[in-house]
């Protein structure tokens, strides 16, 4: 017998509040996966399971069309006290992206038999190296459309994301010295800063006429070096996060990085090694696909305003499926994208 559910606003908010109280940084999402599995069971989903990497997958409805509703369960590190203030709910992941994920859960639950099939997925590691979506894509899900849950606001549809290359750069110098006589040895941290600045200059040059949102950016995000406060460091590890706009390939960026590291290493006469931590190609969806048109009409019907198509400067799970499967895809969800990753994250 077909089941019908009415989800009240209070119940939806309480469900999100419970999800926010589960601390789920990347690759520590099991508690939320178990929570969602129970909710899916209560809401009449079938084939509820977690895959080999920890993604939660459940199915509702039947027949065609088949659509994937996919959000991520992980958040960036850092706890925020879950609390209500006026019309807002604060908490880590409220905007990015447990809010959109729970919205998708209830949207999928409304699917009725023989009107189409909805595959609901909560992925792991979106904020890390995209382990979840890469595994899901490798399994080639049987879907005709895909919507990814990320904060865009109700009147915006995300059609494009930058790509990403993250590199680890390791600098080794021959010797160390007492901090009171720094001229006796090269300083690995100082050398690392020279490498980072040179690589940044090489990658970011020639973009004077581009808008900021369309520029390639190279950002130093981590640096580790030194054994003692009074000894010059022999080793230094740093991480560079490089965001790549549509129209530039990861391969071309890697070639520039490789050449720059070799040239700087030779000039500075220090050992330098780099490795690729993560690589995701940029992606932009078709602006006039059936999915974009249908979502636009739905927003017009509810909000009485035509939504704006936007490109984001980050990188999302949409990149992976968009570049791998020939199906219409978009990203959409409640929340302010500028609140993501902040100490005042709210929805």
Predicted regions and their residues:
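Buried hydrophobic positions in well-ordered alpha/beta secondary-structure cores of metabolic enzymes
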Residues: 23, 40, 58, 69-72, ...
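Active-site metal-coordination/substrate-binding segment of hydrolases
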Residues: 64-122, 343
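Acidic/histidine-rich catalytic neighborhood of metal-dependent amide-processing enzymes
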Residues: 98, 102-166
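Metal-dependent amide/peptide-bond hydrolase catalytic core
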Residues: 7, 152, 159, 165-347
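N-terminal helical capping/dimerization or prosegment-like subdomains
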Residues: 1-68, 235-239, 253-256
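Active-site nucleophile and cofactor-binding loops and adjacent substrate-binding regions
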Residues: 48-49, 89-97, 308-313
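Short glycine/serine- and small hydrophobic-enriched flexible loop segments
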Residues: 18, 106-113, 194-201
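Short glycine-aspartate micro-motif
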Residues: 66-68, 89, 144-148, 166-168, ...
């Amino acid at each position: 017998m077909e089941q019908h559910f009415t989800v009240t606003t209070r119940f939806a908010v309480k469900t999100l509040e419970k999800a926010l109280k589960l601390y789920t940084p990347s690759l520590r999402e099991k508690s939320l996966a178990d929570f969602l599995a129970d909710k899916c069971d209560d809401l009449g989903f079938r084939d509820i399971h977690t895959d080999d990497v920890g993604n939660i997958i459940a199915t509702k409805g039947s027949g065609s069309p088949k659509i994937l509703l996919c959000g991520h369960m992980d958040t960036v590190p850092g706890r925020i006290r879950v609390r209500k203030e006026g019309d807002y709910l604060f908490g880590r992941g409220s905007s990015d992206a447990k809010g959109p994920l729970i919205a998708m859960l209830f949207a999928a639950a409304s699917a009725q038999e023989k009107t189409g099939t909805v595959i609901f997925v909560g992925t792991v590691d979106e904020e890390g190296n995209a382990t979840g979506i890469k595994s899901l894509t490798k399994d080639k899900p049987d879907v005709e459309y895909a919507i990814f849950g990320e904060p865009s606001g109700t009147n915006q549809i995300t059609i494009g994301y930058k790509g990403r290359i993250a590199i680890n750069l390791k600098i080794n110098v021959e010797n160390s010295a007492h901090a009171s006589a720094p001229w006796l040895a090269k300083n690995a941290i100082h050398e690392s800063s020279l490498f980072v600045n040179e690589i940044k200059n090489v990658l970011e040059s020639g973009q004077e006429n581009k808008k900021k949102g369309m520029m390639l950016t190279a950002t130093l995000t981590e640096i580790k070096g030194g054994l003692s406060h009074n000894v010059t460091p022999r080793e230094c590890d740093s991480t560079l996060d490089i965001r790549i706009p549509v129209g530039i390939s990861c391969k071309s960026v890697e070639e520039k990085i490789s050449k720059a590291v070799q040239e700087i290493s030779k000039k500075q006469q220090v050992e330098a090694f780099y490795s690729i931590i993560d690589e995701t190609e940029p992606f932009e969806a078709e602006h006039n696909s059936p999915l974009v048109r249908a979502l636009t009409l739905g927003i017009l019907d509810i909000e009485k305003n035509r939504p704006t198509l936007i490109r984001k400067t980050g990188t999302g799970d949409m990149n992976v499926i968009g570049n791998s499967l020939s199906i219409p895809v978009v990203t959409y969800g409640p929340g302010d994208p500028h609140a993501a990753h902040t100490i005042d994250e709210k929805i």
